[in-house]
Amino acid sequence: MSENQDTQKSFLETVKFDDRGLVPAIVQDHETGKVLMMAWMNLESLKMTLEKKKACYWSRSRNKLWLKGESSGNMQDVHDIMIDCDGDTLLLKVSQKGGACHVGYHSCFYRKTTDGEQMEICDTLMFDPEEVYGKKS
């Protein structure tokens, strides 16, 4: 397909959702390039994200739309949405307010290993999840 033909298709027509109607979305800080999280999107959440310029995902555990930051206030303003060469993965470039991770860190990728056994925290704790979401029963 030529470059011209490739850009003639609409963005939504290009996205290849899986058999559950989902596509993975990698979320990246628009200024630093730091990877913040990975989430799932369906057609409805993608359309809402495009319309509102706020990240909206599909929660597989709750089986419903999830506007990022709706309960915590840690919203994601969307600057760009990119699609990979196969059309089966999205990259959202966002400005993150507060932490992206539900356990309180700036990024969900807040742990690292150098030896394959021990882990260390390599990110900034932005908030106390118990204060934001309440204690788990």
Curated annotation (Swiss-Prot):
Pathway info: Amino-acid biosynthesis; L-histidine biosynthesis; L-histidine from 5-phospho-alpha-D-ribose 1-diphosphate: step 3/9
Cofactors required: Mg(2+); Zn(2+)
Protein name: Phosphoribosyl-AMP cyclohydrolase
Location (main, coarse): cytoplasm
Cofactor detail note: Binds 1 Mg(2+) ion per subunit. Binds 1 zinc ion per subunit.
Binding, Mg(2+): 84, 86, 88
Self-association state and partner proteins as the record states: Homodimer.
Gene Ontology MF: a single term: zinc ion binding
InterPro entries the record matches: PRA-CH, PRib_AMP_CycHydrolase_dom, PRib_AMP_CycHydrolase_sf
Catalysed conversion reaction: 1-(5-phospho-beta-D-ribosyl)-5'-AMP + H2O = 1-(5-phospho-beta-D-ribosyl)-5-[(5-phospho-beta-D-ribosylamino)methylideneamino]imidazole-4-carboxamide
Location in the cell: Cytoplasm
Listed GO biological process terms: L-histidine biosynthetic process
HAMAP family (alphabetical): HisI (MF_01021)
Enzyme Commission number(s) of this protein: 3.5.4.19
Species name: Chlorobaculum parvum (strain DSM 263 / NCIMB 8327)
Keywords (A to Z) from UniProt: Amino-acid biosynthesis, Cytoplasm, Histidine biosynthesis, Hydrolase, Magnesium, Metal-binding, Zinc
Function noted in UniProt: Catalyzes the hydrolysis of the adenine ring of phosphoribosyl-AMP.
Enzyme class: hydrolase
Phylogenetic lineage: Bacteria, Pseudomonadati, Chlorobiota, Chlorobiia, Chlorobiales
Similarity remark: Belongs to the PRA-CH family.
Annotated binding of Zn(2+), by residue: 85, 101, 108
GO cellular component: cytoplasm
